[in-house]
Structures are given as structure tokens and as C-alpha cells.
């Protein structure tokens, strides 16, 4: 019989979540974090300053996201890690290097640790595009929060199903 596995957006109180935020372009990343925390709170995650369920780590920029994400994922304390950043194209190839290394690094953390890592790094050509994605038109931080809830739940379902068989 075919099995179907899906994550849920309920029972979020059971998840331990880490959010790693790049400080560079904090006008954008601060808004992403706000949207993400709003989503998590509305789904039952304790986002208060004395929360035992959520931790937020700030890093200098998107390039530093993978190492801190890996450290948190390896700690065994979190069911899911969310990364938030904003890399905006400039006149030099720096954008391409940062985006490539950050995305590869973040993806490898998830594969190597088995902890879902949500890729919440905006890659845009202009600051205006980044701001539109961080709150002017919509806030993708909310979407990243939902992805974290779904993946954290799904991994729990999969672990239970595979350990039972």
C-alpha cells in the first residue's frame, strides 16, 4: 500500500527552531525576520524573548550563514533551521560568488545533518525588489516560517514512520 507523508502546520509547539539572519542589508533582513516570527507566533511557536522554543543568531552577511547554520544543526537542539539574507546585485561579480557559496553551503548543511534548512536568502537585482519581497508587496519571511513548520513536522512524521518499520 502506498504511503503518503505530509507535514502539518499544527502542533508547532513541539518544534525547536533556529533562525540565522544576515545583518548585511538589515533593512531587508529585519523585515524578513519580522514576517517569519509573525508566522511562527500565529501558528503557536513561542517567539517571546525568553522562549525555549526559538533562537535567533545574527551573522555579518549571507556568506557566513552556512557555518552558523551547520553549528546549530549539529547541536541536536533544533528540528529545523531558517536562514534569512538579502544579496543585492552590484557592479562587480561579488554577488555571484556570495550567492553561489551561500546557497551551496546552506544546502549541504541540510543534506549532511538531516536537519531541514529553509533557504530564505533573497537574491535580487535592486534594493527595491528586495524590499518588495520583504514587506512592501508581500513578506517572504512569512513563507519561510511556513516552510519551516511544514518541514519540521514532515521530518518528525518520516522519522516515526521509518523507525516503526
UniProtKB/Swiss-Prot annotation:
Keyword Transferase: yes
Catalytic reaction(s) noted: (2S)-2-hydroxy-3-oxobutyl phosphate + 5-amino-6-(D-ribitylamino)uracil = 6,7-dimethyl-8-(1-D-ribityl)lumazine + phosphate + 2 H2O + H(+)
Binding residue positions for 5-amino-6-(D-ribitylamino)uracil: 24, 62-64, 86-88, 119
Keywords assigned by UniProt, alphabetized: Riboflavin biosynthesis, Transferase
EC number: 2.5.1.78
Stored InterPro entries: LS, LS/RS, LS/RS_sf
GO biological process: riboflavin biosynthetic process
Annotated pathway: Cofactor biosynthesis; riboflavin biosynthesis; riboflavin from 2-hydroxy-3-oxobutyl phosphate and 5-amino-6-(D-ribitylamino)uracil: step 1/2
Pfam families: DMRL_synthase (PF00885)
SUPFAM superfamilies: Lumazine synthase
GO molecular function, one term: 6,7-dimethyl-8-ribityllumazine synthase activity
A single GO cellular-component term on record: riboflavin synthase complex
Binding site for (2S)-2-hydroxy-3-oxobutyl phosphate: 91-92, 133
Classification via Gene3D superfamilies: Lumazine/riboflavin synthase (3.40.50.960)
Record-annotated active site: 94
Similarity-based family: Belongs to the DMRL synthase family.
Function text: Catalyzes the formation of 6,7-dimethyl-8-ribityllumazine by condensation of 5-amino-6-(D-ribitylamino)uracil with 3,4-dihydroxy-2-butanone 4-phosphate. This is the penultimate step in the biosynthesis of riboflavin.
NCBIfam families: lumazine-synth
PANTHER family: 6,7-DIMETHYL-8-RIBITYLLUMAZINE SYNTHASE, 6,7-DIMETHYL-8-RIBITYLLUMAZINE SYNTHASE DMRL SYNTHASE LUMAZINE SYNTHASE
Protein name stated in the entry: 6,7-dimethyl-8-ribityllumazine synthase
